[in-house]
Amino acid sequence: FYLNTAFKINDQNPLGSAAGYGSSFKLDRDFTTKELGFNELKYNVISSQMNRGKVEKSVAIAIGSLASTLSKFSADICFYMTQELNFISFPDEITTGSSIMPHKKNPDVFELIRGKCNIIQSLISEFNSISINLTSGYHRDLQLYKGKIIESIIDIKNCLEIFNYSINKINIRKNI
């Protein structure tokens, strides 16, 4: 849901809005919309400028929502693996032993996914801090979003791949 919404918000061609309130260059915005693969044109150039940073925030919210789900799922796995519950287990290849309790299997993979996903969820707060006192138009501060967004997309993709690999190795205790 959130990822689809973020995609729709971002699938509008802002080309021609320039750094502030439009451009004096003759530009066929319908043509560039089609050629750049956008679904539609962002008609109001002032709206494009007012939305600077907001489109990135929509992606951050979508990724954060996915990270929240993955973090909670990982936390549940860690909880269900506790000695008190012992509902599930995983093979040695994705767990580690404890230095003081060698028989114990630590769910490191899921603990690290949980931690990484919690960091990803903080992205929206970082974005809000960057843009809180900016006026309309372009500001160099906004370029700080790009690296953070790319890093978070890579991180959530890696978390999903590792989670998918690991969850397929789950052993569910029978007769609980």
Predicted features along the sequence, with ranges:
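Glycine-rich cofactor/substrate-binding loops
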Residues: 101-176
